[in-house]
UniProtKB/Swiss-Prot annotation:
One of its GO terms (biological process) is isoprenoid biosynthetic process. It catalyses: isopentenyl diphosphate = dimethylallyl diphosphate. InterPro entries: Aldolase_TIM (IPR013785), FMN-dep_DH (IPR000262), IPdP_isomerase (IPR011179). This is Isopentenyl-diphosphate delta-isomerase. The gene is fni. CDD domains: IDI-2_FMN (cd02811). Belongs to the IPP isomerase type 2 family.
């Protein structure tokens, strides 16, 4: 069942080492400004994303839904999004179509005033697999379930290749995406492997409004599926999960590749407000956080709130030390890049 798989994903993400071997945000070093000429309390962290005003350039990335544990997590995350006036996504919502009894694990966020809500479906479910693809009515139901402002379509074909229940068809996804983008504000999102420039051009041609890079550097779904396979004693899937543990395009490089005129969300391996600042300096409008919030969200709102306060404090300190009075000025702060990220930035030159 999908619900059981989602519960497994939460437990593994919380309790096992499922991150890639290298975090590429560490390959960016920021030039320090010793004389900032900025007062800390005057720093403006506000940002506008596709017409929506956020107090901070932060998106609570799509994580979960479909189980009672997920309901608790989504509730605490929604309270956090309301408190800080930032955007929030939910996990893949196909389960709510298959089992209407899970709907409240997503719709719980409707109890809170969130500046922007992001519904979420998987790209593999846009085309026929062993079962039917999501219909237009299914997508409308999902979108309306949380009164969404945006529709995330997540691309997770690496995960689909690794997991036993994976959907392996992709032909026709862009055509269907183009149809959907005519009716919804679609955000294309990778889930840990990043988008290339070729991908970004295809997505923008299909009509997506923004790209969430979800690059290599943070949670590896190949790693998560490795641990699932280990529990099931599935030697072949264990081998595949281990082989592709570090597959993908680094998050910072993917931001550069996808910066083609429409907003970019930088996600994949963000750990703190310093990483967030680096994402913005590389061209992102928002930074997406998932793993850093998940465990706290399964505990209490106060724990998530404290974590978010630390992220924001880090961001503001970075802005202070780069003489950035606002987010626009932060985008122009100076930095250097180190290997191995530097080589990735040469790919399209």
């Amino acid at each position: 069942m999908i619900e059981n798989r989602k519960e497994e994903h939460i437990k593994i993400a919380e309790n096992e080492n499922v991150v890639s071997e290298h975090n590429f945000w560490d390959d960016i070093r920021i030039v320090h400004r010793a004389i900032p000429e900025v007062d800390f309390n005057d720093i403006d962290t506000g940002v506008k994303f596709l017409g929506k005003q956020f107090n901070y350039p932060i998106l609570i990335s799509s994580m979960t839904g479909g189980t009672e544990t997920a309901k608790i997590i989504n509730k605490n995350l929604a309270m956090t999004a309301e408190h800080f006036k930032i955007g929030m996504g939910v996990g893949s919502m196909r389960v709510a179509v298959k089992n209407k009894n899970t709907a409240d694990t997503f719709s719980v966020i409707n109890d809170y005033k969130i500046p922007a809500k992001f519904a979420n479906i998987g790209a593999p479910q846009l085309v026929r697999q062993d079962s039917d693809s999501l219909s237009d009515n299914d997508i409308e139901y999902i979108y309306n379930l949380i009164n969404a402002d945006f529709l995330i379509v997540h691309f997770n074909f690496l995960q689909e290749m690794v997991q036993p229940e994976g959907d392996r068809n992709s032909k026709g996804v862009i055509k269907r995406l183009k149809d959907i983008a005519g009716s919804y504000n679609v955000i294309a999102k990778e889930t840990g492997s990043g988008f290339s420039k070729e991908d970004a051009l295809s997505l923008l041609d299909a009509g997506v409004k923004a790209i969430d890079v979800g690059g290599l550097g943070g949670t590896s779904f190949a790693a998560i599926e490795y641990y699932r396979a280990q529990k099931a004693n599935d030697e072949i899937k264990m081998h595949t999960g281990k082989a592709f543990w570090n597959w993908g395009i680094p998050s910072p490089a993917s931001i550069k590749y996808c910066s083609l005129g429409e907003p970019v969300i930088g996600s994949g391996g963000l750990r703190n407000g310093l990483d967030l600042a680096k994402a913005i300096m590389f061209g992102a409008t928002l930074g997406g956080f998932a793993r850093e919030l998940l465990k706290d969200a399964n505990t209490s709102f106060d724990d998530v709130k404290r974590q978010m306060e630390m992220i924001i404090n880090d961001l503001k300190i970075t802005m202070m030390l780069t003489s950035s009075r606002n987010i626009d000025e932060l985008k122009h702060a100076r930095y250097i890049t180190l290997e191995p990220l530097r080589s990735w930035l040469e790919v399209y030159k």
